[in-house]
Design a protein with these regions (language model features):
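Conserved, well-structured interaction surfaces
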Residues: 90-164, 194, 212-214, 392-398, ...
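Membrane-proximal, proline-rich intrinsically disordered regions
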Residues: 22-76, 255, 314, 323-329, ...
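Bacterial Sec-dependent N-terminal signal peptides
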Residues: 1-31
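Hydrophobic-face positions in mid-chain alpha helices that act as interaction patches
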Residues: 252-399, 403, 458, 473, ...
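Short, surface-exposed recognition loops and adjoining beta-strand edges that mediate ligand/DNA contacts
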Residues: 37-38, 65-85, 167-176, 216-299, ...
Length: 519
């Protein structure tokens, strides 16, 4: 895939045919675009190209808007910058978005983007799913594997859409509230919203079938193909979806399965390269090659500490002081952020509104973290060095799922299942590479709080922040520097669970204009 990925937009049969129109089998036997989808998807090589196209769609620029880059935008704009624990330092011009004031603006591109992106994935996946018939006895193993991959893309997309455009499960009347549009065939006419319960049922059904097909195929993805869904990816999607649905036993079951063959990264990997260089902990990820870069649209062009993009050099990302202060002194993960000393904080060259330093803290930052900064980067207190680009201006790969999330998912589920010893063991296993002094003995509500804390610490900056706070039904509370926190006063807000349309993005006007079954 790395040099030959084909980006496909398979929203129509014609586009599917265009994807494979250069394949010699069709050039030799039929005119361009003459082959039927049944013929195309009976050929494993052609079907594989279509699934590779789905992977490429996760790192592609969209809507002619800088920064809308596929999956990375969802992580940064919708998961991180709008959350409780990350600040886009001094980027006050974007405060309306980062402070969650766009949820009810149905004509905004920020409301429309996730809908557009995930339904583009769904439409493409449906071409593969509907084009490959797997009920017969003579179906090639690879076709089963490819169909299972497409089912993973669809299940993941439906799940992500439900997190954004539907109420949190606890407020959904046990799933009776509106879900999303469940397009599972090639029709494109008007279609109403499902319920949220129906949405989760479809996600589960897709994953059940994917798991069955993966197992029946007897195939594993190739070494290094972290961008391609496989059996463990299906397990991981299942675990995350079940956790969000508060289906605790299912979440614990699939989290354990998903992480079984993906050991946690070492301490050195975690501190230096574990988030932009694929490693064994990654279960699924997004691949961006230097010869296929999307330049200033890329994920790391928005939150890479060493990126050359002005968005990172001038407005780096930083952890909240409140979260940083809860990380034990013995925990090596503290080294991923720039904590000011008392002297560095007290000097006049540290701006007490923005948190920017032009003095002692700046000097130390370039001395200690010079290889993780661009030469002209501005320095702010608590700025991060966890996420770095692999090539300029801000390119590189990143994970969607990794084992640490599965440990934390299983631990959170175990808390709700009254399996306290199991949850304690999972936390100890997760943290031993970072803090040799760590030993969890907490119980009850304190144990659940501990799991949530380490989820915030270990998965910081990976796109979970806003989504976790939504499902937990906890308020976002950001404190300004003047009030003992680290946020610019423009971002220092409290967002209650009932604010911002209950943290639910409205159905975009573009969909309602086209689909008269949605009002």
């Amino acid at each position: 895939m790395k040099k030959n990925i084909l980006y496909s937009i398979l929203v129509s049969c014609t586009a599917v045919l265009a994807l494979v129109s250069c394949s010699k089998e069709y050039l030799d036997t039929q005119p361009e675009y003459a082959a039927s989808p049944d013929v195309i998807f009976s050929d494993a090589d052609a079907a594989r190209l279509a699934v590779n196209g789905l992977s490429k769609m996760m790192t592609t620029q969209y809507l002619s808007t800088q920064g809308m880059n596929g999956e990375g935008t969802i992580k940064s704009w919708y998961g991180n910058f709008t959350g409780n624990d990350m600040q886009k330092c001094n980027q006050t011009g974007w405060a309306a978005l980062w402070n969650s004031t766009y949820q009810e603006r149905d004509t905004s591109p920020y409301d429309y983007y996730p809908w557009f992106y995930y339904y583009k994935l769904v439409g493409n996946a449906n071409q593969v799913i509907c084009g490959i018939e797997t009920d017969g006895e003579d179906v090639a193993s690879e076709l089963k594997f490819i169909k299972a991959q497409a089912l993973c893309f669809r299940a993941y997309s439906f799940f992500m859409l439900s997190q954004l455009y539907s109420h949190r499960w606890v407020d959904s009347n046990n799933g009776a509230d509106p879900g999303i549009v469940l397009r599972i065939d090639l029709s494109d006419g008007a279609q109403g919203l499902s319920t949220l319960a129906e949405t989760y049922k479809q996600v589960y059904d897709d994953l059940d079938l994917a798991i069955s097909l993966f197992k029946a195929s007897g195939i594993s993805r190739g070494k290094g193909e972290f961008y391609a869904p496989d059996l463990e990816v299906a397990y991981a999607i299942y675990a995350r979806a079940a956790l969000t649905r508060e289906d605790w036993a299912t979440a614990a079951q699939y989290a354990a399965l998903a992480r079984a063959d993906h050991p946690l990264m070492s301490e050195s990997q975690y501190l230096d390269s574990g988030f932009n260089e694929p490693n064994d902990e990654w279960i699924w990820g997004v691949y961006e090659a230097s010869d296929q870069t999307i330049y200033y649209y890329s994920f790391y062009a928005y939150q890479g500490s060493n990126a050359s993009s002005s968005n990172c050099r001038s407005y780096p990302t930083a952890i909240s002081k409140e979260l940083y202060d809860q990380i034990p002194e013995t925990d090596s993960r503290r080294r991923l952020w720039l904590e000011p000393t008392e002297e560095e904080y007290a000097e006049s060259k540290l701006n007490k509104t923005t948190g920017r330093s032009t003095g002692l803290l700046q000097t130390r930052a370039f001395k200690e973290f010079g290889d993780k900064l661009y030469s002209t980067s501005l320095v702010f207190m608590y700025m991060q060095f966890k996420h770095m680009c692999s090539f300029y201006p801000g390119g590189g790969s990143f994970n969607i799922f990794r084992s640490a999330e599965m440990y934390l998912t299983e631990a959170e589920a175990d808390c709700h299942l009254n399996k306290e010893a199991e949850a304690q063991k999972l936390l100890n296993e997760l943290n031993k590479n970072h803090d040799s002094a760590y030993n969890c003995t907490k119980t009850g509500d304190d144990l659940l709080t501990e799991v949530k804390l380490y989820r915030r610490i270990d998965l910081w900056g990976e796109g979970f922040d806003w989504f976790d706070y939504k499902r937990w039904k906890q308020p976002i509370v950001r404190k300004s520097i003047a009030d003992g926190g680290s946020f610019h006063s423009t971002f220092a807000i409290t967002l209650k669970p009932t604010d911002a349309n209950n943290w639910t993005w409205v159905i975009p006007n573009k969909e309602k204009d086209y689909n008269d079954l949605i009002k």
